[in-house]
Each structure stands twice: as C-alpha cells, then as structure tokens.
Amino acid sequence: ANDTDVNTSGGSITINGDVVGSLVELDIDTTANSGTSGTIKITGDITAKTGGGADEILVLNAGSGKIDLGGAVGATTSALKSVTLSSTNTAADAVKLAGNIKTSATAGAIDITGPVTIAATDLVIDADQAATTVTFASTSTVNATSAGTQGLTINTGAGNISMGGAIGGTTKLKDLSINSATTGAGDITLANIGSSTDGVHGATSIGNANTGTINLNGSVYKTVGSQTYQASATGDDTGNNINIANTVTFTTTDTNIKFETSDVELADNVSLTVTTGGSTAGDIEFEGSIHGTTGGTDATHIAGLTSGTGTVTLNAIDTDIEDITITNASAGSTILKGNITTANNGVLSITGDTKIGADTLAIDTTAGGGGSVTITGKLDSLTTSRNLDINSGTAVTEITEDIGDVVAFTTLDINAVVGDNTNTGGVTLGGNIGGTAAGSGNTQIGNTKTTGAITLSGTTYFTSGTLDFKSNGVGGSYVINNASDVTIKTTGVSTVTFGTNDLTIGNAKLTIDTDPGDTGANGADITFGGNILGASGGVAADLELDADTADVIVLGIGHDGSNDNNEINDVLLTGSD
C-alpha cells in the first residue's frame, strides 16, 4: 500500500459512489493557489480495506471550498486510524456530513475544521476502540439541517474530545451525547450549546463516571431537553473535574440540569446561572460540591439557581464564592446536603422552602465581616431530624416562614457562635418554630455579642429542648412582633431563657410554658435577664409565665428600671414556692 495524493489546484472533485482503498494515506486537496478553492464531494461511503492494516489515514482539504460527504467514513470494522476534514469556508454547511465516522483500533485522531451541518438523521462519531482524539476547531460550529431532526453522538475511549465551536447555535440538534454511553476516560471540552435560541431539542448528556475532566469554556448552554454533565469523582483534577471557565448561563425548558459525580470548580471572576424555568418543572442537582478558585482575586458568584416548581439539590459550596442566590416557585424546594461558606461578605438568599439533608450542616457567611442569610419560605429537616447552624457575622439572618413544622431539627443554632466578637448580626423569624409538635430540640438564637435585634413574628415557638435567646447587654434587643397571641413552650424539662436586654411584646398575650398541658413533668426555669415591656401605642398585653414547680426569674415587668411602661395588662406567674 502507498500514499495517494489528489491535488486539483482549486478545481472541484466529485466522486459518485464509494471510495474503497488499502492505502497508508489518501489525501485529496482542492486548495487553490489563488481565488476560490474547489469542492470535495463524495456521494458514497469511504472505507479502507482491513487487509491493509488498521492505520490508514484520510485527509480531505478543501481550502475555501466545501466538503460534502454523502456516506459513512469508515465501516463497521474500520481500518481508518485518522480522519482530517478541513475547510476555511464560513458557510454553515462548509462541511456536510450525511454518514457516520468510525476509526480503527489504532490510536489516531479525528480533526474537523470548518462549520459542520449534519445531513443524516443522526451523526455518530465512533472512536471508542482506542485513544483516538476528536477535535472540532473553533470555527467548527455544529448544526442540524432541520431544527430538532438530526442528533450528534461522539464516543471515544481514552481519547480527548474538544468542541471548539457552538453546537446548535443556528439550527438546534435533535439530541446530543458525548461519551455518555461509554466508559471512556478522555477529557471533554465544550464551547457553547445553543445561543439566544435552543441548541438541542432533546436530551444533552456529556461524560460518564470515568471522564477525566469536562471543561465548559462557553457562556451559554441552552436546550429544550435535559442537560447532564458527569465526570470522575477523583480523576485528573483531584475531584474538581467539571470546570467552568467563564460567566455562564445553563438553561432548559421544564427539564432537569444535573452535574453528576464530580465537584464543580468555578474560575475566578465567574458568575454562574442555572435555570429550568421560573414557574415550571425541572430539577437542578449538583451531586458534588461547588468550589471557587483558591487564591482568586475577583468576585465569583452563583448568580441564580432557578428551578421553578422543581428541586434544587446542593452539596457543599465554598472556596472564594461570594453571593449565592437560589429561587424556587411555591411548589419547589431547595435541598442542602453540605456546608455553605461564602467569602468577602457574600450573602445567601433562598426563595422557596428549604430542607436540610445532612446530619449536621453549617451555613457560614461571616468571612469579611458578614453577609445576610435570607430564607424566604419554610425551613425543615429532610426525612429525619438534622442539626443546623447558621452564622451570618454582622449581618441579619432571616427565615420568613415556619421552622421544623414538617420534619423537626435535632438542634438549631442561629448566630449562636460568639466567634471573634464579630458574630453580632440580628435574627428575624417570620414564622413559627414547630406547630402542634416541637420543631427543634435544643435551640439557641443569638449570642452574648449579638447587637442586632432578635425579632419573633410567629405565634408558636415550640421546642423539645432548651430554648435560649441571647444578646449583648448594650445594643441588642428582643422583640415579639405579632398582633395575635404568642406561645413559647418546651418539653422534656427544658428551660426558656432570654439573656441580657429587654423583651418588648406586641399588643396580644404572651404565654411561656415549660410544662405544656400540666403533664406533671415539673417544668423548667423561665429566665429573663432584662425587663418585659409592652409595645407602646397599642392595647396593653397580657403575660403568662408558667414554669410549673421550677423558677420564674425576671428583672421587671412593665417597668424598665427607671420608668413605668404602662403597656402590660394581666400578669400570671406560676413557679416554685
């Protein structure tokens, strides 16, 4: 077998039928020395006889002309080691492929330069037999002939895959699969999927549990169908094997977006947005953690994870990531399975119900001073009781709806850690803790350095363990802000304590009971380190403190130590003799 070169010096070449050879290399070149290059058109299949070995090479170079292949390249048992298709033409169909490409068991390369249009029902590029690489140049966009009709599948073994141009940026594909149906460990690099319009109509599946790394270098990944990205949990980058290089938006229409097995690493100065629809179905799931870049100098944000009525599932978020925003519609929810740590006063904002899925989970936004933590929705344990710690530094933590009403917490601590005397932010609870049953075990809100207000706007605060409210004696305060009657109660001989600072109650009755139902459990101490005052300008409030046979300790009621408050009405105290 010998090399064969065909050079037309700018003339077109058309072969009507199959091309069969047993050559070491077949090179067809229609590049012109000047002017327009010729077209290379082959209507049939291109195959190499296996008897010639498994290291044959095909090179088609059309210069500024086009390449039009009407059949398959390679066969079921291919003898082609490498395939090169090259065109500098900028038309969307500069390289038209109507058949599959398959290489042999000898490691080689598939290199395509120029915009690609898929003319077959589906295009399958199969290099799964060896460490053959597949490379689409930066000019090599990939589009369907008819929107949503042609799909693309690429399979390699250990070979890397690089898609330098946008996929479906002009005409969307039917579906897209890159090493998702194999166990190949090759790295995968992708530019954009889609543009302002969808790039794929059906499912997009990138990588598998053995994939070395997935490098997402584009700014948009937009599909109608689901998106799945999977890489090794160990592999090339010590587990951070899904890499996002630029500010980027992932979008589907009512379908899931999942990052599986591997952690995700965001480059410095990146903003990540993932959305499956503002008010419709579609889950967002990160099986691994999300990390920023160690030593980064610019802000990295998770600008928005929006799942509509779906579920957002997250593991840990850490390493130089600042603001985090998560949004669900009323029927959606967020599940947190790992610690959330922000940098440089970064805030955490979750809209929609939130469930804690780790045995013990910490949310920490204290770095840089403090960033607010806001959960606009209910807050519960997932399936079984969990431990939750939230610390927001100098900023406020706010939970707007009920805590532990569906599945209770074992322990709950909000801004309870003194830290370096910087965890001073207030706490606002807009709903209840518990309901007909206790919502938490031991619970602490605030600490002895808290200078922000601790505000309770619910009607029930029910724990099965101790309930402590703490603040700094100089700047802190406690406020019960509800026009309806409020009940604070504990079971299990558990104390209720309001530390130093006065408590101001609203224009309704406040009941604190450490033996609800008078079960004979002897109650537990109720302690106030400050005064109990009524809110001014309204109806005077009633007060009932029932410790059963334990102690009720209070500095003053209706008097701040200097002046009468005149906003407290009936008072009933029950305690030890």
Regions found by a protein language model. Give the residues of each.
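Extracellular lectin-like interaction modules
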Residues: 1-577
